[in-house]
């Protein structure tokens, strides 16, 4: 009996010790994880300390290559220095305007720095090229021809201008009433040229603080040079390019500074850099003459309201994928839309489809188009007539 009691006692004791061992093992694993985390933090802090203890570098901008692994750099506020380039730096990448790091003691170039660009400017670049094509634009054959000569031809075939001995055009201005296809044509140009497309609205360049708008314009053209060939599309240019007056308001003077920086950039960059500028506005009458002069804007393309044949072509384009009943007379519909813009013609097709959906039909009838014309003209007729009178 005593033997059985001792056996049970030690058996329970062993079970208790095994439970304690399992708990201690679990605690040990947690402590090992904490130790590993602390060791990682110690290594990170040691690396930071070593980085902080390293000698600092000065930032400079390359002005010109001088040969034999030497470049002329500009530093603020010291001035310009002729410095050596360390063997680890790619000498071919050192071009004018590139930011470099200089040793604090010897001023040798030891690293190439990335270009400093404002995040707001980086967001202006359209990564995905628009899928608009010239076939999706109706009634603008002459405008398409003119903009292709100024923008697309110099980018795709610059040798033609070199053989003729003429300078490439720098920019083009698209002007006309709202809804006549200015932005749509700019998207189509970006699609067919297959180059970087940078879109910016003029109101985005109007900033609160002095000098911010000018800085955005400078960095916008810097980014365009880095990603050349590129197209800068500036919509609503009248917000910063209006005629200068004698106003002493701070807001007006800041807008004028932004426009002066834009004029400087248009004069500064070379035409063979594959940077083209497209500007669009509804109010060409208020633009400053300095912005419109030849050499900055080489061609001005007018976008008038479409005539009857152009409206018919636009109707055919936007109704191409619609499920239409037989016998629809698009010519009659186009003749009823006198003075309408291309955007209003597209709105008629959309409204006609909405009338068909309202009656649970899968096809669009002639009556749907007629009701859509009546609705669109009733909704926008008075407003657009006032705008056209203003633009005359």
From Swiss-Prot:
Gene Ontology MF term list: ATP binding; ATP hydrolysis activity
Localization (cell): Cytoplasm; Nucleus
Record keyword Metal-binding present: no
Any one GO cellular component localisation term in the record: cytoplasm
Per UniProt, the keywords (alphabetical) are: ATP-binding, Cytoplasm, Nucleotide-binding, Nucleus, Proteasome
The record's section on SMART domains has: AAA
The record's section on InterPro entries has: 26S_Proteasome_ATPase (IPR050221), AAA+_ATPase (IPR003593), AAA_lid_3 (IPR041569), ATPase_AAA_core (IPR003959), ATPase_AAA_CS (IPR003960), NA-bd_OB-fold (IPR012340), P-loop_NTPase (IPR027417), Prot_ATP_ID_OB_2nd (IPR032501)
Kindly list the positions annotated as binding ATP: 176-183
Q: What does this protein do?
A: Acts as a regulatory subunit of the 26S proteasome which degrades poly-ubiquitinated proteins in the cytoplasm and in the nucleus. It is essential for the regulated turnover of proteins and for the removal of misfolded proteins. The proteasome is a multicatalytic proteinase complex that is characterized by its ability to cleave peptides with Arg, Phe, Tyr, Leu, and Glu adjacent to the leaving group at neutral or slightly basic pH.
| Family note | Belongs to the AAA ATPase family.
- Relate the assembly described in the record: The 26S proteasome consists of a 20S proteasome core and two 19S regulatory subunits. The 20S proteasome core is composed of 28 subunits that are arranged in four stacked rings, resulting in a barrel-shaped structure. The two end rings are each formed by seven alpha subunits, and the two central rings are each formed by seven beta subunits. The catalytic chamber with the active sites is on the inside of the barrel.
The name on file for this protein is 26S proteasome regulatory subunit 8 homolog
In the record, what lineage is assigned to the organism producing the protein?
Eukaryota, Fungi, Fungi incertae sedis, Microsporidia, Unikaryonidae
């Amino acid at each position: 009996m005593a033997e059985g009691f001792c056996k049970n006692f030690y058996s329970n004791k062993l079970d208790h010790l095994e439970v304690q061992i399992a708990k201690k093992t679990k605690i040990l694993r947690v402590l090992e994880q904490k130790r590993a985390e602390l060791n990682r933090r110690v290594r990170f802090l040691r690396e930071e300390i070593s980085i902080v203890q390293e000698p600092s570098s000065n930032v400079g901008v390359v002005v010109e290559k001088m040969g034999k692994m030497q470049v002329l750099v500009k530093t603020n506020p010291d001035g310009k220095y002729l410095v050596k380039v360390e063997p680890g730096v790619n000498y071919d990448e050192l071009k004018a305007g590139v930011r470099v790091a200089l040793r604090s003691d010897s001023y040798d170039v030891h690293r190439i720095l990335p270009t400093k660009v404002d995040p707001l400017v980086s967001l202006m670049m359209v990564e995905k090229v628009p899928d608009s094509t010239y076939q999706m634009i109706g009634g603008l054959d002459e405008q398409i021809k003119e903009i292709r000569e100024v923008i697309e031809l110099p980018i795709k075939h610059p040798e033609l201008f070199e053989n003729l001995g003429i300078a490439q055009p720098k920019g083009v201005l698209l002007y006309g009433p709202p809804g006549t296809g200015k932005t749509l044509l700019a998207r189509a140009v970006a699609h067919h040229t297959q180059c970087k497309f940078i879109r910016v609205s003029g109101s985005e360049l109007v900033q609160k603080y002095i000098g911010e708008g000018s800085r955005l314009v400078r960095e916008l053209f810097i980014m365009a040079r880095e990603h050349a060939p590129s197209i800068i599309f500036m919509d609503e240019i009248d917000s910063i390019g209006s005629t200068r007056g004698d106003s002493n308001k701070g807001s007006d003077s800041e807008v004028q500074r932004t426009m002066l920086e834009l004029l400087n950039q248009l004069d500064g960059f070379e035409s063979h850099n594959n940077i083209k500028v497209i500007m669009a506005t509804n109010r060409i009458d208020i633009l400053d003459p300095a912005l419109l002069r030849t050499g900055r804007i080489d061609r001005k393309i007018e976008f008038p309201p479409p005539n009857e044949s152009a409206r018919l072509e636009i109707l055919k384009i936007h109704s191409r994928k619609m499920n239409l009943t037989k016998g629809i007379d698009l010519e009659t519909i186009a003749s009823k839309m006198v003075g309408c813009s291309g955007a209003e013609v597209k709105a008629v097709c959309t409204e006609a489809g909405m009338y068909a959906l309202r009656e649970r039909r899968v096809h669009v009838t002639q009556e749907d188009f007629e009701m859509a014309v009546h609705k669109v003209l009733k909704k926008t007729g008075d407003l657009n007539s006032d705008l056209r009178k203003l633009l005359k």
